[in-house]
Structures are given as structure tokens and as C-alpha cells.
Amino acid sequence: RRVADALHCSLEQLLSELALHHLDLVLAGQAAPRNPNLRLTSERLVDSPVEWYGPARLVGKTERDRFPQSLNDLPVLLPTGHSALRPTLDHWFEAQGLRPRIVGEFEDSALLAVFAARGLGVFPVSRLGADDVGLMRGLRLLGSSDGVKEEIHAIRSRRGQHHPLVMQVVAAARP
């Protein structure tokens, strides 16, 4: 199998590999689906509030003061529907009465941030990832999506639960 193929796969593929004991741990944005045949356990490690950032030329005092309504007037970059966060954001948009102008959808959150840093739009990121956003010049905080959180789940097979490195990763991630 090519390295590129191994780096891009669906959650279902990862869970299959986990069930076959080819992997010991999967960190995902959602819990494993209930399936007694897979014999997997999920544990929510973290939930982090979602904030919005954008380039300085798009995010001024007026946009911050009008947030979240300002999302109706700004170009918006979002994760694709494959992301666990996207349905939550779509529900939040609806609850807030927002109709954002979506100008791009990305599978890769780092690429999404690069496009924003180049001035192409505003984007959501969990507070966990906000420190990395700060490394990109010219991005400013627009606002916070009240009630929207991004989750990280540790998904393990029963055999993988006792792997020393898995135990160490999970313990380090707990609050």
C-alpha cells in the first residue's frame, strides 16, 4: 500500500483496521458507532469550544461586535461534511438564523487555515487548535460559537486497551 493511501482514509476504514488489531488506537472527532461485532470502546477525552478566526483585513471591530451575524457577510471556509464538526456547525447556523456565504470546504484543517491566512475567508477552529492558529501571521479572533464544541474520542479495541503507549496517550489527554 502506498504511503499516501495510508494517510488518507475514512473513519470506517480506521475502525476496521482497529478491529483487525492492525491499530491499537484511533483518535477521532466522534465516538465509534455502536456495533457489537467490532468490539470497540470509545472514550471522550476532550471537548473544546469552537472559535472563529480570519485575516485582519476581514476581521475588524465591526465584525467582532456583530458576531455571529457578521458570518452572513463574510466569506466562510468550512470543514467538509465528512468532518464530525460540520453537522454541529450547520445546526448552529440554523439555530442562529445564519446563512453564511461558504466559499470553500476543506478535508484538511491545516490547509483551511492557510487559505484563511491568505485572506480568503474566516473559519472555525477548536480552542485546542487556536494556539496553532496564532502561529499564522495576520489571523484574528472573530468570535466564539456558544454551545458548539469539537470533541476528541479515543477509540480502542479491547486488546489495545492495555497497550502501554495507548494507556499513556489516553491518560495524558484526560483533563
Regions found by a protein language model. Give the residues of each.
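Short secondary-structure boundary segments
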Residues: 30-31, 56, 126-129, 145, ...
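A late-sequence structural motif
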Residues: 140-175
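Short beta-strand->loop
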Residues: 40-51, 127, 135-149
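A ligand-binding cleft/hinge motif common to bilobed small-molecule-binding domains
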Residues: 27-37, 110-139
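Ligand-binding cleft/hinge of the Venus flytrap
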Residues: 1, 70, 86-99
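Residues embedded in well-ordered beta-strands
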Residues: 25, 43-44, 51-53, 75, ...
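Flexible hinge/capping segments at coil-to-helix
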Residues: 37-81
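Central regulatory/effector-binding core of bacterial HTH transcription factors
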Residues: 1-35, 106
